[in-house]
Amino acid sequence: MKPENKLPVLDLISAEMKTVVNTLQPDLPPWPATGTIAEQRQYYTLERRFWNVGAPEMATRAYRVPTKYGQVKTRIFYPQPDRPATLFYLHGGGFILGNLDTHDRIMRLLASYSQCTVIGIDYTLSPEARFPQAIEEIVAACCYFHQQAEDYQINMSRIGFAGDSAGAMLALASALWLRDKQIDCGKVAGVLLWYGLYGLRDSVTRRLLGGVWDGLTQQDLQMYEEAYLSNDADRESPYYCLFNNDLTREVPPCFIAGAEFDPLLDDSRLLYQTLAAHQQPCEFKLYPGTLHAFLHYSRMMKTADEALRDGAQFFTAQL
């Protein structure tokens, strides 16, 4: 697709999305486009600080949990003494960026709105970790907390997975992994998926959308994939191309959120249509005027706050 044939996205987004796009952080250096991945991770963490300000205060604890790959950092958010369920959160960032700090506000709001314990898992990033290491770390953390639930004062009889972007893929992949391998970590009551990628290699939205404003050009998406996967055969794995998994049975209830001007939107639409066609419990909601990654901007965007509330409400309705 010639770039000039794409939609003029920045002219079409909502007023509040434009405010976010035009928000300058004067102390921020330029994005290190030609820098190392370590420099890009450092920049991403620095840039997200502004957007994480003002999140709800609550009891928070940091723990390292064992996996076969080594210890993985986790952060537990306790919004209240009662513990109706535990929700595991997987951050986005194209598998190569992001951490518990970059998504701290998202997790705090999700805990506040659901009144459930939220556990963020700081899975090892790519390319240092290759598929399926991140999923195996997430599953290992889930199993660990299931076995040690009383020690951490959490309710692991009912759990959920949630994530944005690449984290959404990891959330659903982890739930399917537990189902397929018959691993008991408690009942998976729901999965919350904000603008994820689920295995499409091409689509209308991938052609019409994506640019420097969202880091989701065709070249960007290829780079993330090459960093994450171990080999070409992994592209067809049912835990990477989730459409190659069995989506006709025992899929936990899924809340699927789409951003209107996201090149990955068709992934969400196809996931919803597939699940709905096979009577799997699911809900799809499109957030008008939004770009990919809008969930970060709840400090300025009512729509981002609404999307988090919608996901929390969906999850608690399953309990």
UniProtKB/Swiss-Prot annotation:
The active site is at S165, D262, H292. It is found in: Cytoplasm. SUPFAM superfamilies: alpha/beta-Hydrolases (SSF53474). Its EC number is 3.1.1.-. Its main location: cytoplasm. GO terms for molecular function: carboxylic ester hydrolase activity. The keyword Hydrolase applies. InterPro entries: AB_hydrolase_3, AB_hydrolase_fold, Acetyl_esterase, GDXG_lipolytic_enzyme, Lipase_GDXG_HIS_AS, Lipase_GDXG_put_SER_AS. Keywords: Cytoplasm, Hydrolase, Serine esterase. It is an enzyme of class 3 (hydrolase). Pfam families: Abhydrolase_3 (PF07859). The keyword Cytoplasm applies. A motif (Involved in the stabilization of the negatively charged intermediate by the formation of the oxyanion hole) lies at residues 91-93. GO terms for cellular component: cytoplasm. HAMAP family: Acetyl_esterase. Displays esterase activity towards short chain fatty esters (acyl chain length of up to 8 carbons). Able to hydrolyze triacetylglycerol (triacetin) and tributyrylglycerol (tributyrin), but not trioleylglycerol (triolein) or cholesterol oleate. Negatively regulates MalT activity by antagonizing maltotriose binding. Inhibits MelA galactosidase activity. NCBIfam families: PRK10162.1 (NF007547). Homodimer. Interacts with MalT and MelA. Belongs to the 'GDXG' lipolytic enzyme family. This is Acetyl esterase. The gene is aes.
